[in-house]
């Protein structure tokens, strides 16, 4: 997809699970579980996705996903898995690498959106900015 001078790419960064009750709020489980199944801990499986905007001058990553450096306790609680999806693999499928990212835009401070900003394999070049 292209918007203005930017080509847009969907970048899958990880899989994880969140409590179905927290995700669906006041919607009763018998209603939402018709479409989404939960595991034995009532977590629903989700995929984190970032958006990459590419122009001749910039490669802008919007959000970074969960990241990879989680204590085992939190990996287990949130069922974080980067085996199938991670930033490097997803950027690579489009011919890019994290070293080419010039800017990162953080939409908000939830771990599944900015977890890779401060401690992960995502490496920004010295001219990259958040």
Question: PLM features: residue spans?
Answer:
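Conserved small/polar residues in nucleotide/adenosyl-binding loops
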Residues: 120-126
């Amino acid at each position: 997809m292209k918007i203005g001078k930017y080509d847009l790419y969907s970048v899958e960064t990880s899989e994880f699970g969140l409590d179905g009750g927290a995700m669906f709020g006041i919607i009763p489980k018998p209603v939402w579980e018709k479409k989404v199944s939960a595991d034995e801990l009532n977590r629903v499986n989700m995929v984190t996705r970032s958006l990459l905007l590419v122009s001749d001058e910039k490669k802008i990553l919007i959000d970074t996903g969960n990241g990879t450096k989680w204590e085992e306790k939190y990996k287990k609680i949130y069922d974080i898995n980067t085996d199938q999806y991670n930033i490097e693999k997803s950027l690579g499928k489009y011919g890019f690498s994290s070293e080419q990212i010039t800017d990162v835009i953080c939409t908000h401070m939830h771990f599944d959106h900015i977890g890779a900003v401060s401690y992960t394999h995502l490496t920004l070049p010295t001219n990259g900015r958040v």
